């Protein structure tokens, strides 16, 4: 979907996503010392707002103006400051390198998917961390939710290989299970999680 499609989706519901941070973002980032962070494809800002609450200086990048407006209101309500940038990641916006880069549930076809991964990797300062979370391709047939198009899905090792070629040190690349609460009860989604670090020097 393009930006106008997402604008419409964000208009239709009070919150498209949960107000809580992604469980894997919370788990992987909780013990890191706060610094500067980028939340790429931030949506309504749930992860960016949580980071700001933990003491991070956060820039949230999103291509839907409606999502950014909602994110600003949510950040104000939470009493935290988040810098918002309207930009399309497929156009590789000029962003300053930071200590932590989040790329959470951004699903694009090739070659855009790999190009955005490479751009995200270039935004990690030496010693910093890139965390990629998304729906795994296997989720399409064995899990719950997520895009129905296999062309926009990947497996962890595919993401890891792109990041290795940028020079990042891949610390983890694995499938992880996430419980999704539905009207029919709890369902299991199969996500991918890739954690990669920019090696100093």
Protein language model annotation of sequence segments:
Residues 98-113:
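A short SAM/SAH-binding and catalytic strip from SAM-dependent methyltransferases
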Residues 71-72:
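Conserved SAM-binding loop
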């Amino acid at each position: 979907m393009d930006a106008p499609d997402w604008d419409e989706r964000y208009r239709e519901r009070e919150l498209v996503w949960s107000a809580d941070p992604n469980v894997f973002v919370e788990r992987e980032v909780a013990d890191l010392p706060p610094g500067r962070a980028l939340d790429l494809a931030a949506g309504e800002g749930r992860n960016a707002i949580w980071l700001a609450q933990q003491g991070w200086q956060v820039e949230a990048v999103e291509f839907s103006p409606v999502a950014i407006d909602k994110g600003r209101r949510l950040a104000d309500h939470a009493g935290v400051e988040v810098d918002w940038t309207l930009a399309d990641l497929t156009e590789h916006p000029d962003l300053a390198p930071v200590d932590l880069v989040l790329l959470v549930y951004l699903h694009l076809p090739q070659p855009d998917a790999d190009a955005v991964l490479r751009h995200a990797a270039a935004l990690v300062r030496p010693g910093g961390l890139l965390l990629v979370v998304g729906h795994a391709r296997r989720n399409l047939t064995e899990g719950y939710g997520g895009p129905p198009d296999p062309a926009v899905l990947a497996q962890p090792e595919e993401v890891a290989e792109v990041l290795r070629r940028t020079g990042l040190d891949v610390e983890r690349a694995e499938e992880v299970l996430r419980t999704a609460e539905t009207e029919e009860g709890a369902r299991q989604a199969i996500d991918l999680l890739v954690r990669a670090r920019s090696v100093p020097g």
